[in-house]
Every structure is written in structure tokens, then in C-alpha cells.
């Protein structure tokens, strides 16, 4: 439901191109647009660019975010419908096309550490929208959809439209607006008993000017938000009708696959194409700068042919690099004096000198692949001075710009039809649209025939944009009572400063960074720097508790007296997990806490370590304070999924580099947690009333340190490097 086809995009092109540009600016920037609608659309009234109401009283919400399993199409629609006071049974959803009018600039607000004052909001949003148009921002990532677009875009648009409909009804009935109310897609006038549907009023309402700052409902008045309404995307996924990027089929379409330079930065030197060209079904062999592609009448034929090739690549001077050398370079950099400053409170070094005890630790995390279920795929057709692309991306506008550059065209000559994503996790964000670029270049070479590019799983694993490998070094000081009084951390990478800050009251904090760059491609990975930093912080906090000879949970709670929300979440997690109760001798519990993307998550893991040193995670309790909830069922699913995603990385995830290239190639050497070994997960929400936080990523970071801390509780062995299973086996074998 709600995907754009080529015909649909063309039919509303006049709407988008003709000035229906409210986007994520304040609704007050929207002029009367009814007159500029193409004839095919004039039976519909657009109150804002996000809301369209037809005479049959159907409300369509335009959602400028992609669907990749997180339920955002439903959640954002709920937020608009709530403020509109719509009848949910009459509400529909349409994913916004890759057009500048639908740039989603309000995601910028979600990353600001402060609120924009109302008096400045209009100007800020206008400037942000212009920037979003210029850079091509239509992004889904950073857990920003609900807390950015939803809070500042959808709710405001719904409230403004509701006020416009009430004003239109009051004018029609010649009564004060204060005497009118909206409910279930109708405007009611109680004194006279009159009523009119939104559909009957929409054309008049569309002529009115929206309010700049329409009042939003109090939480107590919600009837849609806060309920677990069924998601729009589920039925088509159950019956097989959902179309992902890899599912696209066009008349006369050919198939392509690639072999890229195995060493990042390498280039194609030469390739003898004769062998592949002679194979059944092969139509063309296309040389790219750093890869070779085979085009055939079927994917399997293309794959067999590309595997028959023997391309020669240079290694860009990186053929001697391996993982150990990368880590060694980071360690050397951290030993230097010229380190960047990422944060300072008090006097860390001086406090260490005065501490009763100083604890040192070094942690390491490896590169991680995204390993999404749907490999990289894109379909392209270049003909008659235009280019069309069908792909699943996390930023259609940015992907359109990449496609335009590859096609040698202006963005206006490119149409990108975004599809559902079989996973994203940051792999399909700007900066990683290599698969789109390749598809367009191949399509240009065989124009005007359309071609679908599909990467093999091996290409997908070995040519990812990986989560960065980090080394972090910590020094912590505790006083005579065991309280933490100093925290000094050094780590590599351009990490987010907020991710590196512990949530605990320390008093003296110092954060320093190095910036050693390897040739390995790096990119966003679900929860970004929080995934590394939470492992470091929560592992080290556990070490401080152990040095202080105090219970790890109680130790943390004592350091959270300044933060009632964090304290409440952690205390609740302890209660629900029966922290401190008896366990079998081979079982242990570990705890971890994070605040990420405006959401606080506390997790307790119950772990078994078998006689064979195999880690089994039996249960995870997660307590989440995201302020409030839009769709509780979807929110719980995101936390549960984040825990399983993070657990795969914590136990098994590791990309290693040898001779400049990635060693792992498929799920046999890059394994995942399966249904059989997934833990039982309990999720409890705290509705604190704080501003809405994100949900897609905050469940990921705490699971690795929670499991590592549980392993220590069982074995007494502190694992300071991921993945945990390989590290535990190595540690135990060295002790044998």
C-alpha cells in the first residue's frame, strides 16, 4: 500500500513542481495551491503537502520516510491523524515521492541538543527546508522519523488542517469557530446540530491560511496515538504482495551482477571478457572504474559468467594491510600527545592522582557489516535524455542526485521510485549509494534496455560500508568509599561526543580522540557510535564496581541520583529481572544503560556459559523511557529487534582484514543469532512525559555490555574485545 509508481509520480508532477512546497517548513509558508493542481487532481484538496482530503472523506497522509520494517509509515500517519481528529478507518498512507517538495528537514531538529524557541521556529524551519532541498535530504535514519518529522511536521500539519476545516465550517454556517469541534472526520456544531464531513469542507478549507503555531492536543486527549493500531505494511508482507527493490520487474529487463576490486581503493586494470561473453544468455560485459559487470537474460546466468571472469585489479597501495595493523596504528596514535578534545568536566588527570585506586582498561571492537536480508539491488533505465531508477534507499532525494551524476544528467531529469527495504540499518544512507551508481552506469552502457543489478551475498558482505573498528583506553579513579571520582577516556574515530559521555555522575571527566584512518570503507550502522561507546562505558563501569567491591546495579544507581529518569529505568530493570535472586552456578546477570536518540534504555541479560564455554543468552529485560509512545506494539518490536540485532554483533559479528581485503563472505563465517538461540525478551515502557525519543536504535547498544558483564559474573573473566564468543573461547583455551 502507498508506493509510488511511475504513472503516479508523473500525474502529480504538476502538484509537486508547481509549488505545493510546505514540506517540513512551518505550515504558514503554504499558499493557496488549489488552483495549481492538475485537472486529474482537482477532486482532491491539499490542506498541506502532507495531507490530502478527497470528497469521499478519505484522508491521505504523505509520509517522507521509507519503510524498512520499523513501522514508520503507520506511526507518522497516526500522528497526523491524531491532531486532525480523523476517523482512522478513513485514513490512508502514501510514501512521498523523491521530489524536492517532500524534503524532510525536520529531522534536523531531532538532532539538536536544545529546543528551538517558538518565536524562532518559523525562520529556522524555513532555512532548514531550503537546506534540505539543496542537499537532497529525504532521509530515514538516526531514529529521527517520529521525534523529528512526526513531532514537528505531522502533528503540526494535522493540527493546522483541523483548524482550517473548523474555520471553513464556521464560515459556511456563519457561527463562531469556538462553537465548532472536530471529531471522527467531521466538524460538528452542537448548538444547531449541524455537521459536515472533512471531505465536504476540504475545498473551502484549502483556500485558508494555516496557523503558524496551531495548538496541539494534550496527551490525555489522544485517541489514536498510544494505541497499537495494525501497521499498513504488514498485510502485503504476509501475502507476498510487498515489492522490495530486488522484486522490480520491467518489460524487456535484463539482469546484471558485479565483481568489485577486493581491496578498497583498488581499480580495474584489465579483464578478458571473451569467456563471459560466450556464455549462454550473456548480453554484455561492462567495465567500471573499480568493478566489472556482466549483463544477461537472468541473474543466475549473469552470476555464473561474472565468476568465470579473471579480472585484474590494483590494490591502491593497501594490499599489505590487516586488522592487527589497523588496531596497532590506533594504539600508537592514542599514545601520542596530539589528541583531540571531545569533552571535559572538572580535572580528570588531577582527580586520578588523588584517587584511592586507579583502574585501567583497554577495549576493542571490530568492523561490522550490515548483512541485511535483501542484498544491494537497483533497477535502472536510461533513455531519451532521462533516467529512471527503482531501488530501496534510506534517502531517495540523495540517491536521485547520485543517479543523476552517474547518468550525466541534472536531478530533474531523473525519477527515483523508492521501494520497500529488506533492511537498512544505515547501509542505504547517503554516502553508500554505490549500488545505485553502478546500476545507472550499466544501464547507460546498454541503453535503452532496463537492467536490474543484484549483488551476490559475497559482494554484499565484502563491499559494505562497515561500522568502524575502535580501540578505547580508560582510566578511572575511585575514592575510599568506592565512588567514581575520575573518568579519563581515549578512543579512535570521529565519534559523536554525546555517545562517549557516561550517564553517571562522575565529577571529573576527560575525553580525548585520535583519528587514524584506514582504507576500509566506513558508514553508519544501527545506533552508530553508541554501539561502540556503550560497550566501552558500561564494561568499564562494571570494572569500577568490581574494584569497589560493590553490586554492579547498586553501584550504577548510586551514581544516578542526579538523573531521576535514568535511575527509574535502571531500578525497574533490576526489579523485573529479579536482580540478586539465586541462579544456577553456570548462569549470571549483567546490566547496562544508555541514553541515545532521546531515549533511555536499561537492559539486564541472563546468560549461561556451558562447560564447553558456549554462551547462551536466556533472557533479556529492557526498560525503556522514550517519553511517550505512538504505537506501543511497534515500539516493543523495535526494541526486541534491536536487542537481537545487537546480540548477533556482540556474540559473533566480526569483519577482519587480511591483505587489504575482507575475509568473511557469507553467513557461514558471518553468523547471526537464529530463532533457536534467541533469548526471551521482556520490554517495559515508562511514559515519563518527556519529549518523544527515537525507538529504532536505542535497544541495540546495551546488549553487548550487558552480556559481557553477565559472562564476568559467571566466569570471573573480563572480556574487553568483541565478538564475545570467539573471545571467550580464546580466553578459556589459553587458561587450559
What does each model-identified segment do?
Residues 674-692:
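Generic long, charged, amphipathic alpha-helical segments
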Residues 528, 541, 686-699:
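Amphipathic, heptad-repeat alpha-helical segments used for oligomerization and assembly
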Amino acid at each position: 500500500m502507498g508506493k509510488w509508481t511511475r504513472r503516479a509520480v508523473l500525474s502529480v508532477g504538476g502538484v509537486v513542481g508547481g509549488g505545493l512546497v510546505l514540506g517540513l517548513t512551518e505550515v504558514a509558508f503554504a499558499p493557496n495551491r488549489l488552483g495549481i493542481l492538475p485537472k486529474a487532481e482537482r477532486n482532491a484538496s491539499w490542506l498541506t503537502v502532507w495531507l490530502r482530503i478527497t470528497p469521499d472523506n478519505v484522508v491521505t497522509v504523505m509520509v517522507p520516510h521509507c519503510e524498512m520494517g520499523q513501522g514508520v509509515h503507520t506511526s507518522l500517519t497516526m500522528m497526523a491523524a491524531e491532531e486532525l481528529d480523523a476517523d482512522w478507518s478513513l485514513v490512508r498512507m502514501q510514501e512521498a515521492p523523491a521530489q524536492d517538495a517532500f524534503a524532510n528537514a525536520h529531522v534536523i531538529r531531532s538532532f539538536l541538543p536544545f529546543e528551538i524557541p517558538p518565536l524562532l521556529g518559523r525562520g529556522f524551519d524555513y532555512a532548514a527546508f531550503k537546506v534540505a532541498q539543496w542537499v537532497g535530504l529525504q532521509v530515514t535514519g538516526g531514529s529521527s522519523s517520529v521525534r523529528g518529522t512526526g513531532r514537528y511536521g505531522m502533528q503540526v500539519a494535522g493540527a493546522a488542517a483541523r483548524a482550517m476545516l473548523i474555520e471553513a465550517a464556521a464560515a459556511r454556517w456563519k457561527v463562531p469557530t469556538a462553537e465548532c469541534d472536530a471529531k471522527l472526520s467531521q466538524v460538528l456544531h452542537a448548538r444547531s446540530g449541524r455537521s459536515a464531513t472533512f471531505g465536504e469542507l476540504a475545498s473551502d478549507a484549502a483556500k485558508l491560511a494555516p496557523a503558524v503555531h496551531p495548538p496541539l492536543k494534550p496527551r490525555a486527549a489522544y485517541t489514536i496515538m498510544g494505541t497499537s493500531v495494525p501497521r499498513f505494511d504488514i498485510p502485503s508482507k504476509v501475502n507476498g504482495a510487498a515489492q522490495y527493490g530486488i522484486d522490480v520487474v520491467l518489460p524487456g529487463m535484463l539482469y546484471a551482477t558485479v565483481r568489485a576490486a577486493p581491496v578498497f581503493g583498488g581499480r580495474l586494470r584489465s579483464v578478458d571478457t571473451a569467456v563471459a561473453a560466450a556464455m549462454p544468455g550473456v548480453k554484455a560485459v561492462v567495465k567500471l572504474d573499480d568493478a566489472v559487470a556482466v549483463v544477461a537474460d537472468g541473474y543466475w546466468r549473469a552470476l555464473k559468467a561474472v565468476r568465470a571472469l579473471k579480472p585484474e585489479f590494483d590494490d591502491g597501495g593497501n594490499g599489505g594491510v590487516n586488522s592487527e595493523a589497523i588496531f596497532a596504528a590506533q594504539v600508537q596514535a592514542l599514545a601520542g600527545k596530539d589528541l583531540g578534545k571531545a569533552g571535559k568536566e572538572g580535572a580528570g588527570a588531577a582527580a586520578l592522582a588523588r584517587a584511592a585506586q586507579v583502574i585501567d582498561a583497554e577495549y576493542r571492537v571490530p568492523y561490522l557489516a550490515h548483512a541485511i536480508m535483501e542484498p544491494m539491488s537497483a533497477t535502472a533505465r536510461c533513455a531519451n535524455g532521462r533516467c529512471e531508477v527503482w531501488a530501496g534507499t534510506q534517502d531517495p532525494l540523495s540517491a536521485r542526485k547520485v543517479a543523476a551524476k552517474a547518468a550525466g544528467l541534472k536531478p530533474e531529469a531523473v525519477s527515483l521510485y523508492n521501494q520497500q527495504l529488506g533492511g537498512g540499518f544505515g547501509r542505504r544512507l547517503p554516502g553508500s549509494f554505490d549500488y545505485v551508481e553502478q546500476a545507472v552506469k550499466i544501464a547507460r552502457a546498454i541503453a535503452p534496455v532496463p537492467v536490474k543489478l543484484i549483488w551476490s551475498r559475497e559482494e554484499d558482505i565484502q563491499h559494505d560500508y562497515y561500522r568502524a573498528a575502535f580501540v578505547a583506553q580508560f582510566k578511572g579513579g575511585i575514592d575510599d568509599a568506592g565512588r567514581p571520582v575520575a573518568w579519563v577516556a581515549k578512543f579512535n574515530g570521529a565519534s559523536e561526543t554525546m555517545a562517549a559521555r557516561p550517564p553517571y555522575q562522575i565529577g571529573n571527566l576527560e575525553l580525548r580522540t585520535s583519528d587514524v584512518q584506514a582504507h576500509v570503507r566506513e558508514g553508519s550502522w544501527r545506533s552508530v557510535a553508541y554501539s561502540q561507546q556503550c560497550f566501552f562505558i558500561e564494561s568499564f563501569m562494571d570494572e569500577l564496581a568490581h574494584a569497589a567491591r560493590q553490586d554492579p546495579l547498586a553501584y550504577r544507581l548510586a551514581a544516578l541520583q542526579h538523573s531521576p529518569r535514568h535511575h527509574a529505568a535502571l531500578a525497574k530493570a533490576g526489579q523485573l529481572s529479579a536482580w540478586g535472586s539465586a541462579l544456577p552456578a553456570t548462569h549470571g546477570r549483567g546490566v547496562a544503560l544508555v541514553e541515545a536518540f532521546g531515549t533511555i534504555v536499561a537492559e539486564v541479560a541472563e546468560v549461561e556459559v556451558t562447560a564447553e564455554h558456549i554462551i547462551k543468552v536466556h533472557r533479556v529485560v529492557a526498560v525503556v523511557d522514550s517519553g511517550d509512545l505512538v504505537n506501543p506494539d511497534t515500539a516493543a518490536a523495535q526494541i526486541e529487534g534491536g536487542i537481537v540485532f545487537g546480540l548477533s554483533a556482540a556474540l559473533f559479528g566480526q569483519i577482519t582484514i587480511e591483505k587489504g581485503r575482507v575475509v568473511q563472505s557469507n553467513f557461514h563465517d558471518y553468523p547471526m543469532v537464529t530463532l533457536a538461540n534467541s533469548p526471551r525478551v521482556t520490554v517495559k515502557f515508562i511514559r515519563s512525559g518527556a519529549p518523544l525519543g527515537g525507538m529504532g536504535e536505542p535497544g541495540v547498544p546495551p546488549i553487548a555490555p550487558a552480556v559481557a558483564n553477565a559472562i564476568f559474573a559467571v566466569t570471573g573473566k573480563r572480556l574487553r574485545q568483541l565478538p564475545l564468543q570467539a573471545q571467550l573461547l580464546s580466553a578459556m583455551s589459553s587458561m587450559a
